[in-house]
């Protein structure tokens, strides 16, 4: 009887631990994509741009100088930097490059890059190029911790990305530091450049929802029909005053 109770307790504990884990990738099927199409476009901003507040540097001021506020970067031709573009609901397509690692560096008391997208099964390499201690604390939107690593100067740590979702990155030593890692179950994601441009390739033909996310301007979705061997143009416009514009 005692052994049975012990086994039941262990099973219950395992169930609780599984429930606490972020959502795992089970739905995406990797195939050889034939006659794949592509989607490209721009993410732009319209309307009056807000004045971004200066970051409050409260510690290690001799090292942490001129840290920019990267929460809203608008480049030439009103292009929006650091928007995440993803295909929603895609269940099969090209393989995830699992040996591909995404680097997140601590440099001049800021995370670099500020926003990136990755796939479940890939890795993020955490670095500290500063001469001071940093931490890299990644938490998903549901507040389940992904990883929390202390990085002394010059230290490197490699962490697997095991679940899909938006991870917000913070440094517990320097509270103004922030970054985002947008993790999807598939490889169809992109980050807009300084001109607001993006591109997705080798997409299986079909109809999809294309979603754009930005930390300050919200989200927007549009339908796209991907045709065999063809390039589709799909542009987005976001407004600081009204949020995402459909």
For each predicted feature, which ranges?
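N-terminal secretory signal peptides that target proteins for export/translocation
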Residues: 1-6
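Sec/Tat signal peptide C-region and signal peptidase I cleavage site
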Residues: 21-27
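Extracytoplasmic copper-binding redox domains, predominantly the cupredoxin/blue-copper superfamily
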Residues: 27-246
């Amino acid at each position: 009887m005692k052994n049975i109770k012990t086994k039941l307790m262990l099973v219950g504990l395992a169930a609780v631990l599984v429930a606490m884990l972020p959502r795992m990738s089970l739905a995406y099927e990797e195939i050889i994509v034939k006659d794949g199409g592509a989607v490209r476009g721009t993410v732009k901003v319209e309307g009056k741009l807000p004045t971004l507040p200066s970051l409050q540097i409260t510690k290690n001021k001799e090292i942490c100088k001129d840290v920019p506020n990267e929460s809203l970067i608008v480049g030439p031709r009103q292009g929006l930097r650091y928007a995440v573009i993803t295909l929603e609901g895609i269940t099969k397509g090209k393989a995830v490059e699992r040996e591909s690692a995404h680097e997140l560096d601590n440099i001049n008391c800021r995370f670099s890059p500020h926003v990136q997208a990755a796939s479940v099964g890939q890795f993020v390499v955490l670095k500290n190029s500063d001469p001071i201690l940093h931490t890299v604390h990644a938490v998903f939107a549901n507040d389940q911790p992904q990883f929390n690593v202390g990085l002394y100067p010059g230290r490197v740590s490699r962490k697997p990305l095991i679940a899909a979702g938006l991870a917000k990155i913070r440094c517990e030593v320097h509270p103004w530091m922030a970054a985002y890692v947008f993790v999807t179950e598939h490889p169809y994601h992109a980050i807009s450049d300084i001109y607001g441009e993006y591109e997705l390739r080798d997409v299986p033909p079909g109809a999809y929802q294309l979603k754009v996310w930005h930390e300050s301007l919200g989200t927007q979705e549009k339908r796209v029909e991907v045709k065999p061997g063809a390039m589709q143009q799909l542009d987005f416009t976001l407004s600081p005053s009204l949020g995402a514009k459909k």
